[in-house]
Amino acid sequence: MYHRNILVEQTDPEIFAAIQAENARQEHHIELIASENYASPAVMAAQGSQLTNKYAEGYPGRRYYGGCEYVDVAEQLAIDRIKQIFGADAANVQPHCGASANEAVFLAFLKPGDTIMGMSLAEGGHLTHGMALNMSGKWFNVVSYGLNDKEEIDYDAMERKAHETRPKLIIAGASAYSLRIDFERFAKVAKAVGAIFMVDIAHYAGLVAAGVYPNPVPHADVVTSTTHKSLRGPRGGIILMKAEHEKAINSAIFPGLQGGPLMHVIAAKAVAFKEALSPEFKTYQQQVLTNARIVAETLTQRGLRIVSGRTESHLMLVDLRAKGITGKEAEAVLGSAHMTINKNAIPNDPEKPMVTSGVRIGTPAMTTRGFKDEEARVTANLIADVLDNPRDAANIEAVRAKVNALTSRFPVYR
């Protein structure tokens, strides 16, 4: 028997100390990593519930275990809500992460040696879209598309390559591309060459849900996403698909890739999806875009180059070469000033992947804590202040003091 009042601090002080330290870091630092966000207390409560104890292999109404009547309710709510958000025919909410969701699509439609087409990792794509070291690059023949001289997706070159190579699957989506993606153009190309069209909106899902970024669901055979990032849920994945693909996708997840689903996480997904259906969520996502635009414009005014010249989403890539600093060093010094970002390669980057010539900046997390136009402008100027004098300890200390004053006014959790 367990006593509910015996918590982590009594059972495992070492883990409790690490949790408390991370809580403090999140409160005191401005989070600018584009793939991170803050889940609501309601989402975290669902994820920390007793649903973690329940095995539920299968799907609602078709389980391999008894006692699933209540977790069935949770999963069906998650399915119904995510379908409503995106206007999808069918949905699977069981993937443990975005990579699992992508792998399930490959398992459903491809055989080893088939040709796939995705965006080059070096120009903004994701490692699960064909990187050589990823299973997608090892199991399949990969053809990549990239950017034109304006650092926009080269749709004409993509179309030519598709007709030349006749891929079985075409993937749209990116992890470091700031502009809107023309999903309709991709869909027409996929149809012309007889390819399955898959879209990975892991980064853009929250924006799509709020109607402030193009929705690929009407155009794609399958759409995958994570449930954290801009969607602001627990860490996990989803797959949306046309009705005719539901059986193949569901079989690819279970029993193809996974066993028992994480019912506590699925319940937390359902809570996040309900939050995403609210008017407040749309207002939030509109502010995410506004904040990103202000940050990009301010950094440009301070002498930094934004890849593609602008942002039309929640993120941007910043070329640091004019400041004589690498992405690796910028990540470290900005971290010292209590601003968390990640180093990121820019197109045709001469530096190694663990060094890079750029950083990626995103606004979902800062917006969740309440930052609006003025705070976005202040944050961008603080970033530039650090990058102007990255090796000046007094400068870093002064910026850190300003960051701490700002974060104290906007706590993540009150």
Curated annotation (Swiss-Prot):
Group of enzyme by EC: transferase
Location(s), subcellular: Cytoplasm
Top-rank taxon: Bacteria
Record's GO cellular component terms: cytosol
InterPro entries recorded: PyrdxlP-dep_Trfase, PyrdxlP-dep_Trfase_major, PyrdxlP-dep_Trfase_small, Ser_HO-MeTrfase, Ser_HO-MeTrfase-like, Ser_HO-MeTrfase_PLP_BS, SHMT-like_dom
Keyword field: Amino-acid biosynthesis, Cytoplasm, One-carbon metabolism, Pyridoxal phosphate, Transferase
EC number: 2.1.2.1
Cofactor: pyridoxal 5'-phosphate
Reaction(s) catalysed by this chain's protein: (6R)-5,10-methylene-5,6,7,8-tetrahydrofolate + glycine + H2O = (6S)-5,6,7,8-tetrahydrofolate + L-serine
CDD domains linked: SHMT
Pathway(s) it belongs to: One-carbon metabolism; tetrahydrofolate interconversion; Amino-acid biosynthesis; glycine biosynthesis; glycine from L-serine: step 1/1
MF terms in GO: glycine hydroxymethyltransferase activity; pyridoxal phosphate binding
Residues carrying N6-(pyridoxal phosphate)lysine: 229
BP term (GO), one: tetrahydrofolate interconversion
PROSITE patterns in alphabetical order: SHMT (PS00096)
Binding site for (6S)-5,6,7,8-tetrahydrofolate: 121, 125-127
Site residues by UniProt (Plays an important role in substrate specificity): 228
Pfam families: SHMT
HAMAP family (alphabetical): SHMT
Complex formation: Homodimer.
Family, per entry: Belongs to the SHMT family.
Chain's role: Catalyzes the reversible interconversion of serine and glycine with tetrahydrofolate (THF) serving as the one-carbon carrier. This reaction serves as the major source of one-carbon groups required for the biosynthesis of purines, thymidylate, methionine, and other important biomolecules. Also exhibits THF-independent aldolase activity toward beta-hydroxyamino acids, producing glycine and aldehydes, via a retro-aldol mechanism.
Protein name: Serine hydroxymethyltransferase
Organism: Polaromonas sp. (strain JS666 / ATCC BAA-500)
The gene coding this protein: glyA
